[in-house]
UniProtKB/Swiss-Prot annotation:
Pfam families on file: XkdW (PF09636)
Gene3D superfamilies: XkdW-like
Family named by the database record: To B.subtilis YqcC.
Cross-referenced InterPro entries: Phage_SP-beta_YorD (IPR019094), XkdW-like_sf (IPR035950)
UniProt protein name: Phage-like element PBSX protein XkdW
Encoding gene per record: xkdW
Length: 109
C-alpha cells in the first residue's frame, strides 16, 4: 500500500506537509502528523481506501503520441472521403458537359 496515495484518495484536497506528514523509519510508512479536521485514520481505513483506489484508478490523460495517431487516422479517413467525393463530382460534371455538348449538337443541326 502506498500510504500517500490512500490518503489523497480519501482527501483529494489535502496538502502534504501541511495537512499531514508521513514518515518511514525503516519499518514501513506511518502518519507522523495529522492536521486534518478528521479523525486519524486507522490502518484498516487506510487499507480500505487503498483497495478502493485500486478498483477506481484516477483518470490518466491519453499519451500525446496516442492523440496524434488518432488525429492522423481521422485526417487520413477525411482525406479519403474527400477524394472519393471529388472523383464522384468530377464524373457527374463530365456527364453534364457531355449532355450539354449533345444538346448543342442537336440545336446546331
Amino acid at each position: 500500500m502506498i500510504l500517500y496515495d490512500a490518503i489523497m484518495y480519501k482527501y483529494p484536497n489535502a496538502v502534504s506537509r501541511k495537512d499531514f506528514e508521513l514518515r518511514n523509519d525503516g519499518n514501513g510508512s506511518y502518519i507522523e502528523k495529522w492536521n486534518l479536521r478528521a479523525p486519524l485514520p486507522t490502518q484498516a481505513e487506510l487499507e480500505t481506501w487503498w483497495e478502493e483506489l485500486q478498483k477506481n484508478p484516477p483518470y490518466e490523460p491519453p499519451d500525446q503520441v496516442e492523440l496524434l495517431a488518432q488525429e492522423l487516422s481521422q485526417e487520413k479517413l477525411a482525406r479519403k472521403q474527400l477524394e472519393e467525393l471529388n472523383k464522384t463530382l468530377g464524373n457527374e460534371l463530365s456527364d453534364i458537359k457531355l449532355s450539354l455538348l449533345s444538346l448543342k449538337g442537336d440545336y446546331a443541326e
